[in-house]
């Protein structure tokens, strides 16, 4: 065996033999130390003569001899080190993808290769029976003789291969070899062998302890490892696939099959793929003609869960789990002979007879690499690859096996993904410019300009998008400049527009746009920002000020910022060759100079004190910058060039210029130096071969980098010498150094990729980098979404797409401290209102809608608007107070209190007692006085709770006017400290009790003195009149009222509106309000419809009022002061497992009241909310649930960012539904029932399919187990709500009826009756028992399929049945019914009544007639009976149906959690959404129609039995009738066909009606599908209507007699269907 080595020493780099020789790198090492007063050898040639002189050597002492030998060794070692350095500094080419590593020749022919990752080797079996051992990199170790004659060898991985590492096969049978390749076990002669048994390939399955053996006769045998892998036992008999002329088992693969991910074996068999069940050991599937010709290889890709096949038709195909084609790779020009999948990637390698080895990316659906198989120069026959072996461990090579050789390919990844942007990236910059200081205070960001006109700021450490500027595609950037300390972004478009944006917001806002002057005036064509950054602390303080004010500096801040020493000068180049320096704020030109006239300015770059520019005059000029002067540019030096410089980069006193001349295909890099520094060039063959797309430098390492369209990145030294050539699999559009370590950021299409410095830097540079302190990584999170009104629909769509294009960054060495999380730039909820607004504007712009004049508001609308106005200011407590609309007398009377609080500690009741008041002439007393603890809690600025020494007795005094009450309850009065209750209580406590109130001085200073002259003289309780008139706004107090929207034309709100836009946290205080009770509207509706509420209604009214009061108490507790975390934790532990959250709301509230009578428990629940205030409100209900903690042990929005929205939380729970236990599934379904109204239709469809799958598993949930039974009931509710139709639920109930035991069937019948089934006799269930029998009852999925087919026949029969009157009651054609429990607004009720009364729908279930008003019940009784043939739908309110499927209170689960949480979502059946959704009950109509048919048949049979008192004995032949009786009236006008006119198809109704042997024969398929050719009767034509209309009816039924000869014209064959003649 011969080995050809293609690697270099040290870094194993592929050398370019014609690049540099070693002579150019003979630089002495300054680290070599010389010893003083010691003899040294400057040249090694002096050593040999000295040692050969024996007399002189013998004259030396042993110590001197040892010293001389040590000096010789030291000098030689230094030479070796220098040689290694020179070799490492030579130019080397690094390729992304496959690199040729080594080729091994096998003279005796290659048979098989087995990779041993445990031993770090691979074993090669040749045709002579020898085993060659090689290291993982291909170096030969030793050669052994095989213990038995073998033709193949495979490795057993995992613990199973600890004793028997290899399995071989050959003429002697199967053999197990030890790790030292000695024989451990050999199969016996004749065991498992048949004629032509010789194996062709083997595949171990260590997880199942199995071995698959493909044999020559196209059979597949299964062996099992026994005794810890020491022997094999044949399991079952060999399986033979279907015969095929070209079929032969070529390749085997094992892959998991959904949904249970059970391992199956897949075998390539000609152009088909066979699937074998390893557990049952059967052939379960055959997929034919997947390719045009023979399938040569197949493999499974776990990353995309797809099967990949390669064929000799030159294609590679990717298949879904159900063998639906996903994609086809067409690129090879010859037959594909081998294929493999790289582990833990989406990359597929394929080898073809066209001489190429190609790499395909399944995720990108494209070819990403190609290498030539003839790299080593062998002929086509010898380089034909028969097998590809993927690496078994990271760092191992890919093996391509040929007939007599083996090739090793190194898999190298030069870059890793950093971020994914929505469009192609054109420009990449780093801000602030390198080098970064050691103590980094500012974050490092990447500025990316895309082809769609957008610009993105990304964190260089994590790849997350910080902010974005969304412009149109016509504003595509020609150049960008970004100033991080000022958060300003400059953009020069290709049209010449100069745009300045505020980068402190997300999305960025355009501050101003400077349009170019009209031609022929010079146009701006180049942009650069010079940063004179000398004061890092000043830059950081300026950045913090800008971020604090969202980019808008105040005058004082601007003056302070101008005092620092940092300066930022925007420089613009024009087409006439001039350079302009712009003023920072106005973008006006403050200085202009000629630079490259008459040509345009091409490129601009800068260093710490100079600017470099190049232009069309073929010159490169360096300018000295004076940042503090008005004339800021002064020319230093001019360099003449032969070609225009398209790229510039300045580093110290040197300038690197990239030249291009496309006409002569000239592309090169040249370095210029100042003063006497020479110009540095390199060899022409080192230059790029295409357009230079980027040029940058790393000042710390003094390295340059340039990118080109020839798919290369070149690294250059400070002496302009090529150091590394990175060959990529795509053309980079831009690049930039992003750290002092030398990490590179590339733009490949729309992806940002990171090239680590460790991949290409030599050791000397790595040592230099290690000697420097790495800068600190500053956290740079994404900015929150600020402004939304100015966004267009296209920008919204881009933000929505960006929401899905999450960050792809991974944890990288040194600069990546943590793994980048998925980015959610814009929550989807923030865009709904904007998308709806923009859609309306777009329709208006296109003329699809016409604006109509708004009618004047009615009196009711004005009153409702005024109530909403007051409610917005004074809160939800105003809902229980009459406003006195008619008189508008605000102070004409006093307030009558509905109830008085009796608990002294009940803070919410005392705080909100004034909300339950009505205008009255009788004076009442005020509620119980507040305790000092409550006063301390109500004070917003109290630092701690007051200390009480004496209890306070209740006091009685007069109350203030109504307006004073309202103002006292407003948040404005509460913030300013003028709440009347608080003032009065403090007044009384000051005179009658002894207490210590620790009021901070800031709180006392901010309080508004109310009538300071009377503060110590007259108590506030004696004040009368309109109290708000005595209040004056404080000049230094912030206006606290923050509304979620804008309320125009309000004199009151103008005094309370904030200048700044309220944040999301302030909006939440207004948006989180207890929903007012809607019982009043329902009661008014019933009264309007004529029904008087009874005693039950009065009780409901009281319960609703109590529930409403509890909700108001919750709102009052929102202002209580927080307690310590220890007390919060004690309350949480105290509340564990205290309340059943699945009970009814009223019952649950009562239980909470009984369990926690002390009001501080409710205070603790609000503290829980405050403790987790950073989480969304809807998560507060789940965060303490035991099952939720079990599923998410460490829950946070950082770990689960998708849980920040209801849609994301629901999708997360749906994904966990299939993997968890039945108990957790019940909890998840209960949560999904509450979240369903806020779920999207796509997610609802996904949930519906998953539930159907779980209900029809091989082991479906059993109704005998209580937990699984709860799951079934909840799943049925979700199926109803997701689909809004009853088909799936009816099928599940029918299949469960057949599948479940007998004692479970009554409850299933009850559920079907709850859906509207009208079958008191049980006809349907008796008929269902005849559908299946025996083994068919064991599979619920099969039962569901049978029920589905029967139900479809019933529905088709219902649709085909002509209009006929049914006696089914309770099916009115028109009904205007409002179901009980529905709570709508007044306007919504009138609209729904008008809509329902006009649509012929059935809304009410017959099972609940008591929910109707008397008038509606009368209307229902008088409604006409339903005509089955009419195309009407039977609908029903969803909430009514869900109530019949609700779990009993004792059957619900009891999740552990706190006793009271404010964010509990209501049950689905109690939501407005369920009251507004209508459920389609079409399948129930079909079942009812079927039952009615059976009922009619029973009645007819009973009538016949009554007419024939002596029926014939069973099992006797009935006499043949001898008379013709008139048919029933419903068949009179149907034609009677002749015998030769039988219908070609049998209807479903006939199969239902037939009984006995005739039905069995018809069901078996023996129906009349054509003319009856066995009867030849010379009969006359049959009249369509043989009986005239006036034919008399027989007075009584006559006994059957023989047919008279005159009437013998009608016959009924035995196998005919009577219904086909009707």
From Swiss-Prot:
InterPro entries: WD40/YVTN_repeat-like_dom_sf (IPR015943), WD40_repeat_CS (IPR019775), WD40_repeat_dom_sf (IPR036322), WD40_rpt (IPR001680). Residues 1094-1118 form a coiled coil. This is WD repeat-containing protein 97. It comes from Homo sapiens (Human). Residues 1096-1112 have a biased composition (Acidic residues). Disulfide bonds: none annotated. Transmembrane segments: none annotated. Keywords: Coiled coil, Repeat, WD repeat. The gene is WDR97. The keyword Coiled coil applies. Residues 1090-1112, 1453-1472 are annotated as: Disordered. WD repeats lie at residues 187-233, 290-329, 331-370, 552-592, 594-633, 687-726.
């Amino acid at each position: 065996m011969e080995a050809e080595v293609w690697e270099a020493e040290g870094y194993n780099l592929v050398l370019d033999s014609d690049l540099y020789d070693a002579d150019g790198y003979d630089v002495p090492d300054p680290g070599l130390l010389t010893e003083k007063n010691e003899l040294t050898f400057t040249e090694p040639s002096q050593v040999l003569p000295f040692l050969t002189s024996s007399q002189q050597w013998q004259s030396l002492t042993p110590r001197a001899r040892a010293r001389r030998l040590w000096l010789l060794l030291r000098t030689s070692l230094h030479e070796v080190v220098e040689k290694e350095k020179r070799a490492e500094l030579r130019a080397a080419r690094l390729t992304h993808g496959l690199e040729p590593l080594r080729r091994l020749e096998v003279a005796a022919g290659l048979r098989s290769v087995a990779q041993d990752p445990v031993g770090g080797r691979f074993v090669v079996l040749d045709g002579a029976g020898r085993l060659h051992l090689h290291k993982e990199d291909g170096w030969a170790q030793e050669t052994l003789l095989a213990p038995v004659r073998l033709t193949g060898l495979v490795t057993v991985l995992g613990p199973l291969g600890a004793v028997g590492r290899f399995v071989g096969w050959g003429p002697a049978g199967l053999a197990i070899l030890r790790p030292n390749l000695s024989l451990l076990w050999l199969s016996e002669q004749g065991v498992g062998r048949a004629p032509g048994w010789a194996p062709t390939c083997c595949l171990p399955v260590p997880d199942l302890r199995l071995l698959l053996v493909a044999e020559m006769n196209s059979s597949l045998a299964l062996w099992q490892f026994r005794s810890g892998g020491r022997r094999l036992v044949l399991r079952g008999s060999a399986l033979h696939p279907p015969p095929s002329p070209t079929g032969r088992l070529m390749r085997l693969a094992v892959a998991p099959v959904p949904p249970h991910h059970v391992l199956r074996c897949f075998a390539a068999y000609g152009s088909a793929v066979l699937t074998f069940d390893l557990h049952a050991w059967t052939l379960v599937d055959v997929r034919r003609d997947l390719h045009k010709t023979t399938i040569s290889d197949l493999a499974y890709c776990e990353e995309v869960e797809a099967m990949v096949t390669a064929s000799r038709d030159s294609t590679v195909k990717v298949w879904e789990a159900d063998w639906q084609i996903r994609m086809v790779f067409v690129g090879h020009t010859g037959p594909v002979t081998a294929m493999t999948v790289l582990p833990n990637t989406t990359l597929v390698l394929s080898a073809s007879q066209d001489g190429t080895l190609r790499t395909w990316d399944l995720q990108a659906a494209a070819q990403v690499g190609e290498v030539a198989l003839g790299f080593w120069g062998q002929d086509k026959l010898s380089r034909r690859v028969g097998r590809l072996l993927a690496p078994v461990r990271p760092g191992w090579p890919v093996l391509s096996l040929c007939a007599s050789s083996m090739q090793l390919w190194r898999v190298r990844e030069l870059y890793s993904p950093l971020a994914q942007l929505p469009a192609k990236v054109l420009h990449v910059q780093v801000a602030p410019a390198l080098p970064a200081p050691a103590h980094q205070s500012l974050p490092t960001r990447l500025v990316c300009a895309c082809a769609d006109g957008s610009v993105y700021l990304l964190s260089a450490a994590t790849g997350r998008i910080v902010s974005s500027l969304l412009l149109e595609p016509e504003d595509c950037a020609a150049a960008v400049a970004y100033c991080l300390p000022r958060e300003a972004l400059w953009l020069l478009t290709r049209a010449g527009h100069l745009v300045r944006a505020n980068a402190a917001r997300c999305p960025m806002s355009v501050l101003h746009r400077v349009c170019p002057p009209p031609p022929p005036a010079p146009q701006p064509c180049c942009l650069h920002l010079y940063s004179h950054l000398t004061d890092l602390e000043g830059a950081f303080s300026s950045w913090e000020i800008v971020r604090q004010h969202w980019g808008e500096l105040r005058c004082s801040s601007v003056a302070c910022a101008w005092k620092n020493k940092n300066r930022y000068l925007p420089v613009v180049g024009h087409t006439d060759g001039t350079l302009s320096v712009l003023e920072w704020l106005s973008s006006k030109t403050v200085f202009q100079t000629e630079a490259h006239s008459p040509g345009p300015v091409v490129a601009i770059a800068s260093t710490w004190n100079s600017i470099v520019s190049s232009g069309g005059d073929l010159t490169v000029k360096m300018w000295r910058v004076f940042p503090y002067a008005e004339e800021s540019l002064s020319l230093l030096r001019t360099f003449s060039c032969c070609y225009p410089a398209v790229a510039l980069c300045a580093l110290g006193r040197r300038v690197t210029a990239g030249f291009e001349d496309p006409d002569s295909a000239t592309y090169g890099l040249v370095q210029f130096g100042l003063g006497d520094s020479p110009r540095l060039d390199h060899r022409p063959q080192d230059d790029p071969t295409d357009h230079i797309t980027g040029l940058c430098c790393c000042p710390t390492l003094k390295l340059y980098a340039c990118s080109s369209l020839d798919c290369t990145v070149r690294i250059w030294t400070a002496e302009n010498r090529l150091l590394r050539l990175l060959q990529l699999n795509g053309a980079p559009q831009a690049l930039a150094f992003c750290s002092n370590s030398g990490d590179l950021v590339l733009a490949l299409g729309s992806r940002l990729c990171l090239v680590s410095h460790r991949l290409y830097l030599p050791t000397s540079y790595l040592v230099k980098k290690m000697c420097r302190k790495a800068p600190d990584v500053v956290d740079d999170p994404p900015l929150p979404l600020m402004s939304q009104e100015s966004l267009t629909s296209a920008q919204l769509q881009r933000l929505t797409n960006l929401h899905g294009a999450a960050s792809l960054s991974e944890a990288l060495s040194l600069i990546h401290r943590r793994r980048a999380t998925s980015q959610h730039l814009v929550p989807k909820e923030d865009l709904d209102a904007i998308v709806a607004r923009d859609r309306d504007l777009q329709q208006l712009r296109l003329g699809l809608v016409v604006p109509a004049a708004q009618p004047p508001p009615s009196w009711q609308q004005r009153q409702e608007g005024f109530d909403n106005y007051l409610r917005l200011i004074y809160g939800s407590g105003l809902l229980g107070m009459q406003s006195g609309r008619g008189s508008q007398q605000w102070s004409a009377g006093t307030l009558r209190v509905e109830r008085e609080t009796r608990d002294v500690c009940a803070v919410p009741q005392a705080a909100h007692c004034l909300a339950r008041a009505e205008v009255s002439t009788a004076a009442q007393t005020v509620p119980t006085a507040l305790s000092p603890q409550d006063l301390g809690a109500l004070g917003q600025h109290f630092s701690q709770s007051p200390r009480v020494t004496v209890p306070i007795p209740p006091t009685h005094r007069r109350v203030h006017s109504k307006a004073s009450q309202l103002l006292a309850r407003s948040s404005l009065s509460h913030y300013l400290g003028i709440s009347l209750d608080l003032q009065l209580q403090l007044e009384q406590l000051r005179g009658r009790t002894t207490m210590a109130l620790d009021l901070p001085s800031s709180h006392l200073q901010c309080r508004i003195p109310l009538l300071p002259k009377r503060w110590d003289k007259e108590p506030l309780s004696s004040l009368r009149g309109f109290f708000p008139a005595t209040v004056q706004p404080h000049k230094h107090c912030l206006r606290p009222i923050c509304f979620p929207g804008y309320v125009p034309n309000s004199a009151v709100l103008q005094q309370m509106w904030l200048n700044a836009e309220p944040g999301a946290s302030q909006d939440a205080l207004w948006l989180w309000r207890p929903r007012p009770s809607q019982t009043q509207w329902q009661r008014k509706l019933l009264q309007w419809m004529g029904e008087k509420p009874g005693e039950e209604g009065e009780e409901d009214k009281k319960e609703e009022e109590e529930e409403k009061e509890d909700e108001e108490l919750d709102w009052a507790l929102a202002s209580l002061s927080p307690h310590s975390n220890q007390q919060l934790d004690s309350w949480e532990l105290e509340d564990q497992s205290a309340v059943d959250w699945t009970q009814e709301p009223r019952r649950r509230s009562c239980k909470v009241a009984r369990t926690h009578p002390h009001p501080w428990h409710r205070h603790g629940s609000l503290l829980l909310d405050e403790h987790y205030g950073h989480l969304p409100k809807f998560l507060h209900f789940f965060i303490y649930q035991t099952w939720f903690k079990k599923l998410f042990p460490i829950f946070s929005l950082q770990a689960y960012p998708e849980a920040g929205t209801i849609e994301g939380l629901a999708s997360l729970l749906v994904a966990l539904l299939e993997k968890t236990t039945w108990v957790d599934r019940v909890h998840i379904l209960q949560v999904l029932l509450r979240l369903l109204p806020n779920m999207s239709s796509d997610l609802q469809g996904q949930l519906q399919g998953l539930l159907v799958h779980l209900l029809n598993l091989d082991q479906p949930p059993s109704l005998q187990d209580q937990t699984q039974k709860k799951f079934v009931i909840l799943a049925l509710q979700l199926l109803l709500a997701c689909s809004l139709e009853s088909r799936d639920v009816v099928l599940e109930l029918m299949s469960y009826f057949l599948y479940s035991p007998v004692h479970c069937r009554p409850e299933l019948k009850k559920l079907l009756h709850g859906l509207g089934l009208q079958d008191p006799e049980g006809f349907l269930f008796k008929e269902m028992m005849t559908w299946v029998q025996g083994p068919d009852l064991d599979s619920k999925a099969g039962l569901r399929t049978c029920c589905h087919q029967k139900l479809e026949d019933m529905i088709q029969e219902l649709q085909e049945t002509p209009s006929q009157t049914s006696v089914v009651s309770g099916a009115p054609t028109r009904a205007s019914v409002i179901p009980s429990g529905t709570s709508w607004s007044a306007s919504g009720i009138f609209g729904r009544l008008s809509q329902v009364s006009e649509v012929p729908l059935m809304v009410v279930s017959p099972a609940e007639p008591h929910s109707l008003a008397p008038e509606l019940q009368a209307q229902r009784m008088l409604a006409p009976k339903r005509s089955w043939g009419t195309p009407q739908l039977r609908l029903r309110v969803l909430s009514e149906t869900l109530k019949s499927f609700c779990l009993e209170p004792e059957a619900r689960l009891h999740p552990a959690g706190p006793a009271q949480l404010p964010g509990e979502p209501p049950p689905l059946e109690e939501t407005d959404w369920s009251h507004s959704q209508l459920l389609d009950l079409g399948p129930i109509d079909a079942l009812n129609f079927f039952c009615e048919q059976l009922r009619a048949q029973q009645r007819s049979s009973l009538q016949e039995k009554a007419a024939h008192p002596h029926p014939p004995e069973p099992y006797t032949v009935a006499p043949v009738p001898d008379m013709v009786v008139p048919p029933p009236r419903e068949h009179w006008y149907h034609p009677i066909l002749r015998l030769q006119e039988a219908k070609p198809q049998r209807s479903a109704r006939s199969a239902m009606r037939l009984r006995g042997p005739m039905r069995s024969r018809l069901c078996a398929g023996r129906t009349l599908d054509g003319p009856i050719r066995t009867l030849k009767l010379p009969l006359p034509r049959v009249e369509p209507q043989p009986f005239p209309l006036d034919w008399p009816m027989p007075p009584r039924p006559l006994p059957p007699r023989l047919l008279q000869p005159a009437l013998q014209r009608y016959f009924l064959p035995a196998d005919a269907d009577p219904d086909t003649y009707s």
